[in-house]
From Swiss-Prot:
Family note: Belongs to the bacterial ribosomal protein bL20 family.
Record protein name field: Large ribosomal subunit protein bL20
Keywords for this protein: Ribonucleoprotein, Ribosomal protein, RNA-binding, rRNA-binding
Coiled-coil spans in chain: none
Gene: rplT
């Protein structure tokens, strides 16, 4: 059998790993083994944080909606409940956008939600 020489492929692979590890601190950008380990970790973090980003944005939207709702004399929970009872379907991303950029439209939604809520706020909502 013919002998297989791998120096070209091995150097290419190492060069690609070190190129992608550019910007890391210390040995992680210069030594192949350290760079390879760091690349594996970074891919794991990248995957995890793509999932976490969705939760973080949802939390941010809820905080913005709650702040806008409290300026209109409501809480976030009552606003969402009122919007459901009024059969107004607006997602949290757009509600937060309205609360920040178009407060008059957000106030109109709050008024519609208030009107749809039952008189006794402590009573369970009609389903």
């Amino acid at each position: 059998m013919a002998r297989v020489k791998r120096s070209v492929n091995a150097k290419k692979k190492r060069r690609e790993v070190l190129k992608s590890a550019k910007g890391y601190r210390g040995q992680r950008s210069r030594l192949y083994r350290k760079a390879k380990e760091q690349m594996l970790h970074s891919k794991t973090y990248e995957f995890r944080d793509r999932k976490a980003r969705k939760n973080e944005f949802r939390k941010l939207w809820i905080q913005r909606i709650n702040a806008g709702a409290r300026q209109n004399g409501m809480t976030y929970n009552r606003l969402i409940q009122g919007l459901r009872l009024a059969e107004i379907e607006v997602d949290r991303k757009n509600l937060a956008e309205l609360a920040v950029n178009d407060f008059d439209a957000f106030t109109a939604l709050c008024e519609a939600a208030k009107a749809a809520l039952p008189e006794d706020v402590n009573a369970p909502a009609a389903s």
